[in-house]
Amino acid sequence: MKKTIFLATLTAAIFAGCSSDNPMLPVEGGNGNNGGEGNNELISPTVRATVNTPDNAQSPMSGILEVYPCQAGTSIYYGNYVEDVLTPFPGMYTLKDGNTLGNPARAISLPVGTYNMIYWGTPKYEEPIYSNPAVKDPQLTLGGDLSQQYFGLRQNLPDTTYYPVFDLVYAVKPANIGTEELNAAMKRKVAGLKVIVKDKNNGILSSSISGMKVNIGGIAEKLNLYTAEPVNQTKTVTFPLVLSTDGTQMSNATVMLFPSATSPLFQLIITLKNGTVKTFKQTLSAPLKANTRLTLTLTLGDIFSEEETGNFTIDNWQEESETI
């Protein structure tokens, strides 16, 4: 599959620094407190990354990468030196073709020693995805346990539904600062969903339709920062469909979702210009899994059989899943 998804607002929206409910005060100076080396010199290693492809090979990554240094062999967050002060802010890099592009927004700067590096990023794609993704960032503190922190869904207030998320890739790998580069092989930890709605006669969609949106249930509430495992697959994500320029279909640019529970509930909600709301519901035949994209093509049945709010039929339902 061609690479999909572009990266327009990522730096501001997902990787714009870290916050904490109980922030620890910064520690000044390179004190070498990284598990035994005792070296005051701070090292900023070269950073490279690859990302998995549909055939399970790795290709050089372009996009945004964040690096979270932990104490060796643990999920305990060590932190990162910024201007010789130990802070909870992770390293932040823009990558092109696997290599750092220009000066990093925030370089990894650490004393010589062994660390457990956690990597999260969003690759840049040639084709667009949903333009308004959002996530809740983890709360980072020096010495905190990253296995108790999460990337979470952001609620679509005042509604009870949630926004789609960014395309997130992840890796964990030990590193010896001072003797080696940082080189991460990233794997995608979210699923993609694309919905296409057509008229049953392959003609122009009815001018009586004001809008369409999709609700997809059984979506994980959050991903563990340390393990990338999905948690609490009970939430509903919503997104709109957009009318094509020729008026023959409504669809969405691929949305990214945290993995779902088995047989998530799909709802297509159509609002007519007279205010009537029509809803179609059906469970998907399989869960939305990390590193896959489901394209769902629907052919509308008769949505005008009832004058009042009610259901409608789908004449054709086609699910096509692929690795991304």
Specify the residue positions occupied by each region the protein language model found:
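Short helix-loop boundary/capping segments
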Residues: 192-253
